[in-house]
């Protein structure tokens, strides 16, 4: 047992010394929210490269309502970073999935609550927006100016 604890301490120490960036802690929460709100035949991954804003980066005008959900989510994260000094990609938070809605916990104005509300709003928006197959994997250089 003592060897196990020592090895664990060494591993943690080495990770810290290696200056490895933290993993997106809330990504799992956001994925779970999305899975809860979207149609059963879709996977959360199908939303990762959709339109001009769903996925990494974003530019131009959103091409439809679903893409607008991602645009709003990107801006929400941007506001959380700039106005509240939060780190949305690593911020953990508490929430509950119940009766086809999502409840975020925590005091209003805290980073945890702000980021949860960003993810909640986006996930509910995904669930209420049509997924148009031809908007998946689009040529963003051509369509997102």
Swiss-Prot record:
Cellular location of this protein? Secreted
GO CC, sorted alphabetically, is:
extracellular region
Give the enzyme's EC designation: 3.1.1.4
Active site residues according to the UniProt entry = 73, 119
Q: How is the cofactor bound?
A: Binds 1 Ca(2+) ion.
- In which tissues does this protein get expressed? Expressed by the venom gland.
Q: Which Gene3D superfamilies match?
A: Phospholipase A2 domain
**What are the disulphide bonds in this sequence?**
52-144, 54-70, 69-125, 76-118, 86-111, 104-116
Q: What start-end ranges are recorded for coiled-coil regions in this protein?
A: none
Instruction: Name the needed cofactors.
Output: Ca(2+)
Single biological process term from Gene Ontology: phospholipid metabolic process
Entry GO MF terms: calcium ion binding; calcium-dependent phospholipase A2 activity; phospholipid binding; toxin activity
Signal sequence region: 1-17
Function per UniProt: Snake venom phospholipase A2 (PLA2) that inhibits neuromuscular transmission by blocking acetylcholine release from the nerve termini. PLA2 catalyzes the calcium-dependent hydrolysis of the 2-acyl groups in 3-sn-phosphoglycerides.
Q: Which proteins does it associate with, and in what oligomeric form?
A: Heterodimer; disulfide-linked. The A chains have phospholipase A2 activity and the B chains show homology with the basic protease inhibitors. The A2 chain is found in beta-3 and beta-4 bungarotoxins.
Q: What is this protein called?
A: Basic phospholipase A2 beta-bungarotoxin A2 chain
The protein's organism comes out as Bungarus multicinctus
Recite the lineage of the species. Answer: Eukaryota, Metazoa, Chordata, Craniata, Vertebrata
């Amino acid at each position: 047992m003592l060897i196990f604890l020592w090895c664990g301490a060494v591993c943690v120490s080495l990770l810290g010394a290696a200056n490895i960036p933290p993993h997106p802690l809330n990504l799992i929460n956001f994925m779970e929210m999305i899975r809860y709100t979207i149609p059963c035949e879709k996977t959360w991954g199908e939303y990762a490269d959709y339109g001009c804003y769903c996925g990494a980066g974003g530019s131009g005008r959103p091409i439809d309502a679903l893409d607008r959900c991602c645009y709003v989510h990107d801006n929400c994260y941007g506001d959380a970073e700039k106005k509240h000094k939060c780190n949305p990609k690593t911020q953990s938070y508490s929430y509950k999935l119940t009766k086809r809605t999502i409840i975020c916990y925590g005091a209003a104005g805290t980073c945890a609550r702000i980021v949860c509300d960003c993810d909640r709003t986006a996930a509910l928006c995904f669930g209420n927006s049509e997924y148009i197959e031809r908007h998946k994997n689009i040529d963003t250089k051509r369509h997102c100016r």
